[in-house]
Structures are given as C-alpha cells and as structure tokens.
Amino acid sequence: MRLILDTHVFLWWIVDSPQLSSRVRDVMRNPANELFLSVASAWEIAIKVNLGRLRLPDRPDRFIPGQLMKNVIEPLPVEMGHALYVSRLPAIHRDPFDRIIIAQSILEKMPVVTRDTDIAKYKIKTVW
C-alpha cells in the first residue's frame, strides 16, 4: 500500500516517539508498504524551523533528505492538479499544508497516516 505521512507522523517516526500508535508502527515497518512525505510537509517543517517553532539537529535542507533516505520514505511532489484541487475541498480543515496533503490523498488514491481528526473528516482513508 502507498501511504502519505502527515507531517507530525514523519517527525514522530524519526525520533521514535511514543505518540505513534502501535498500528502505525506496524504499518510503517511493513516492507510491503511504500511511504511518502509530501513536499508540502517539507515546506511546513522548513517554515516552522525558520520561525523558531521547531528545532532540528541540522538545517532542513540537509536533515529532511537524510531522514527520507535513512527511513526509505519517498518525496511526493506537489503538482498543479494537487494545488488546484484544494479549491474543491470543503472548509473543514483550515491548515493549508494539510489541505494539500488531503488533495494529494484524493488524487493519488493514497491513505494518509495521521492522528489529525479533521483530516479524517474528509472522504479519504486514514491510518491511525
């Protein structure tokens, strides 16, 4: 199964956070599953680091690609269609990064690994 990781799931995974559910750990460890991180998540992380709201052990432009490689996670580009599809989404979730991830989930037919209950309100499959 191809899965999109929500930003918090990626950050929790790389530090082995106890906040990850056992189901998520099992799904992410399963070699039959392909894990993806949206470029929107990388952008969100970079912005939060720049604003001082998130600390990383290295600059985002070095840290994130290194973690993707180490954890066998593929980047999921944001395409024009993803960005434009956001205009069709109901206004349940206001976070622009999450709205892109939701659009990617719909258009790419990929579940989202997330604890965010607002994302789960959309007509997409989520894993938690």
Describe each region flagged by the PLM.
Residues 7-8, 45, 86, 105:
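Generic structural signal for small/hydrophobic residues in well-ordered secondary structure
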Residues 9, 41-42, 82, 101, ...:
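Alpha-helix capping/helix-boundary segments
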Residues 53-65, 69-115:
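Active-site neighborhoods of divalent-metal-dependent phosphate/nucleic-acid chemistry enzymes
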Residues 12-13, 43, 128:
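Signature tryptophan residues that serve as conserved aromatic anchors
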Residues 1-38, 51-66, 108, 117, ...:
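Short, well-structured N-terminal submotif of metal-dependent ribonuclease cores
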Residues 39-47:
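Short, conserved active-site loops that position catalytic residues or coordinate cofactors/metal ions
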